[in-house]
């Protein structure tokens, strides 16, 4: 869709593309360049806050109190995507990120419940998430 139209809706831009690139730990400067080169509305006043402040949470929390991230369930609810193998990959990246940043999420009242949810998962599920995430991250 982006390659065809040079445009993504705000939700697609932040909660799908930005979210995925963030969970993959892509350098925010590379994300910014990619967004600038591919979006028809690629102006600094749009892309600087979209990339650095929102989707990549690389401004130190100046624009938002938590990263714009989600598991596959949010994507399924907000889109017409069908459940599939991508859900396990997405969830592995998401939960691995939550676990790797436990201190941050524990301190934030809006996200502390995510640590409890992660901790309740079985050891097998956690091990699988870590393996999938490590295989995908650069």
What are these regions (language model features)?
Residues 1-138:
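C-terminal catalytic domain of photolyase/cryptochrome flavoproteins
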